[in-house]
Amino acid sequence: MPRRYPEYTPERIKESKSYQVLLPKFNARRWAFGCSEWQDHGVDYSFEYVQDGFFHGFRLLGQVKGSSHLKFGNADSFSYALPVKTANYAVECSQPFVLFVVDLISATAYYLPLQDYFIANRDKYEKLKVNTSTISVRIPTRNTVSYADDDLVAVSYTHLTL
């Protein structure tokens, strides 16, 4: 019987392409990042904001998804089918958890801070209790990852409680 090995599936190729698009968009002088040791639990990357050359614990946990079929219903946002298990994990995290959705056609990376999203959309949060596989979230098209990253920096500060 021949040995079996993990397969490099089209889904894994899409995942690799999404990392290739997303990671160079971060300013490496302001963000340290690495593949997460929690990858099998929903976190693909951890990003830490570097302020004036020092680490202060301002972190983001990130789930990265790639798609060649994003549907922009209007110019302000688009809908994304988020796995409910990812949403539940995100809202329970003690650090800011960001969904990164990469448009593999335009090479644009969008982001959605999931805890903030479900706080602002309480009806969506309540739907997480229903036993479904996905929930539709709306991602603003203005939420793009780029060197002009002040909005993402602000998200990294949201865990502060002092």
Language model: regions and residue ranges:
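Interdomain/boundary linker segments immediately adjacent to catalytic/signaling cores
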Residues: 1-11
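Intrinsically disordered, low-complexity coil segments
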Residues: 4, 27-28, 124-128
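Conserved small/polar residues in nucleotide/adenosyl-binding loops
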Residues: 158-162
